[in-house]
């Protein structure tokens, strides 16, 4: 099979999985994305949060520009605390690589009891952030801002 065919097949499979409401893909960032979609009822695309304010997306510095950006800073800080946990500080066990289990029922997020200490901590970081995102207003003027100007 040609690589282009494999990519097409993969795209179809991923689309079908999403359409069938099958549980999220087992990758932490996909889990976080799906938590955000659960909490905000799918009202905003997850990519809208990727380059927002000073803290939503990669890195972060300065003072958060608004409530939503504060949610991202709190999430970043929470992941920083997770990395300090002995259960989370070995290779491929940190917040970006550890897979946890959770439920989304009627837009309510619950981290499951079968998570170990590290997974439970990370799940709660993501859960808290997703709920925070859902409750914070989205200000379009804070998307893709000049970080050198606004985030020092």
Swiss-Prot record:
Protein name stated in the entry:
Acidic phospholipase A2 57
Q: Provide the residue positions that the database annotates as binding Ca(2+).
A: 55, 57, 59, 76
Tell me one GO biological process term. Answer: arachidonate secretion
Q: Which UniProt keywords apply?
A: Calcium, Disulfide bond, Hydrolase, Lipid degradation, Lipid metabolism, Metal-binding, Secreted, Signal
**Protein origin, superkingdom:** Eukaryota
Q: Which organism is it from?
A: Hydrophis hardwickii
Role noted for this protein:
PLA2 catalyzes the calcium-dependent hydrolysis of the 2-acyl groups in 3-sn-phosphoglycerides.
Q: What is this protein's tissue specificity according to the annotation?
A: Expressed by the venom gland.
Cofactor binding description:
Binds 1 Ca(2+) ion.
Q: Family assignment?
A: Belongs to the phospholipase A2 family. Group I subfamily. D49 sub-subfamily.
Q: Which cysteines are joined by disulfide bonds?
A: 38-104, 54-151, 56-72, 71-132, 78-125, 88-118, 111-123
Q: Which GO terms describe its cellular component?
A: extracellular region
List residues traversing the bilayer: none
UniProt xrefs under Gene3D superfamilies: Phospholipase A2 domain
Prodomain residues: 22-27
The entry lists its GO molecular-function terms as: calcium ion binding; calcium-dependent phospholipase A2 activity; phospholipid binding; signaling receptor binding
Span of the signal peptide: 1-21
Q: Where in the cell is it found?
A: Secreted
This protein's cofactor list reads: Ca(2+)
- Does the entry feature the keyword Calcium, yes or no? yes
What is annotated as the active site? 75, 126
């Amino acid at each position: 099979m040609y690589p282009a065919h494999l990519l097409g097949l993969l795209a179809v499979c991923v689309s079908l999985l999403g359409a069938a409401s099958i549980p999220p893909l087992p990758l932490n960032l996909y889990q976080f994305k799906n938590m955000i979609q659960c909490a905000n009822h799918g009202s905003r695309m997850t990519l809208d949060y990727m380059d927002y304010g000073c803290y939503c997306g990669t890195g972060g510095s300065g003072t958060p520009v608004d409530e939503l950006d504060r949610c991202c800073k709190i999430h970043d800080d929470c992941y920083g605390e997770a990395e300090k946990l002995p259960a989370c500080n070995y290779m491929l066990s940190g917040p970006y690589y550890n897979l946890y289990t959770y439920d989304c029922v009627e837009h309510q997020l619950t981290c499951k009891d079968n998570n170990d200490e590290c997974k439970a901590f990370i799940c709660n970081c993501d859960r808290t952030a997703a709920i925070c995102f859902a409750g914070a207003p989205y200000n379009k003027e804070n998307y893709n801002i000049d970080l050198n100007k606004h985030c020092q």
